[in-house]
Regions:
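Short S/T/G/P-rich N-terminal loop/turn motif that feeds into the first structured element of a domain
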Residues: 1-69, 78-89
Length: 89
């Protein structure tokens, strides 16, 4: 299963990407694989990614872990604007 995620950032994509990359091993342990991650060409505060995931439940559980909530906050993710769309294969 794949998921599309779009979210607004407060501090730009470079700052966000450093923190995102630091969590790669935790994502791998959860069975989450990043396919593509990029910001918009004209807006470095708008991030998009597509990930391969075991299920929506796994992603939701991963994102609600306190340590990941803190990481997203530190990365400048605006939680209220996040879009998560499951994709058909």
């Amino acid at each position: 299963m794949k998921i599309y995620i779009s979210q607004e950032l407060e501090n730009g994509s470079d700052h966000w990407k450093k923190i995102f990359d630091s969590l790669e091993s935790q994502r791998q342990e959860a069975g989450i694989r990043t396919i593509v991650v990029a910001c918009e060409a004209e807006n470095s505060n708008k991030m998009h990614c597509i990930m391969e995931i075991p299920s929506m439940d796994v992603v939701k559980e991963f994102m609600t872990r306190p340590e990941n909530q803190e990481a997203m906050k530190n990365a400048g993710v605006k939680m209220e604007g996040r879009v998560m769309i499951p994709l058909a294969d």
